[in-house]
Swiss-Prot record:
It is found in: Cytoplasm. HAMAP family: IF_3. It comes from Pseudomonas aeruginosa (strain ATCC 15692 / DSM 22644 / CIP 104116 / JCM 14847 / LMG 12228 / 1C / PRS 101 / PAO1). This is Translation initiation factor IF-3. Belongs to the IF-3 family.
Amino acid sequence: MIIKREMRQDKRAQPKPPINENISAREVRLIGADGQQVGVVSIDEAIRLAEEAKLDLVEISADAVPPVCRIMDYGKHLFEKKKQAAVAKKNQKQAQVKEIKFRPGTEEGDYQVKLRNLVRFLSEGDKAKVSLRFRGREMAHQELGMELLKRVEADLVEYGTVEQHPKLEGRQLMMVIAPKKKK
């Protein structure tokens, strides 16, 4: 019995552009190493100019007529591209959702501590999930919980905007606050 396996290819990997002798066009629009346009030349002339400069001839745009090629150091070009992608990935921050739990009888001191933490989360660019849990007979006084969440919303108006208004899920009231966009 023969088991056929599929070869997995990395979907992110882009095909490399044709380089030097691998370019199939007879004529190309050439851009020099300095970025200046040389004009339309034969492929042999373009490869000769690239070899004189001790650089590579790289096909930039195969769709154009004639194809656009550039004289450059291809290895250095790949390195710079990889470096830029790494910097972009490093600078990309994933916003997390941080949760703070309240109770209907949360005292003023505890409220202020939790509020400070919410301010810190929002100023760091994270979303904040404010949950208020009811126990036992506290469910009969849901309006106290709503008042507390309205107070939290009012206290955080300069740091964030309410993304999800207070909503009762089982024995919990929940609200999500997103940080304000920086200008």
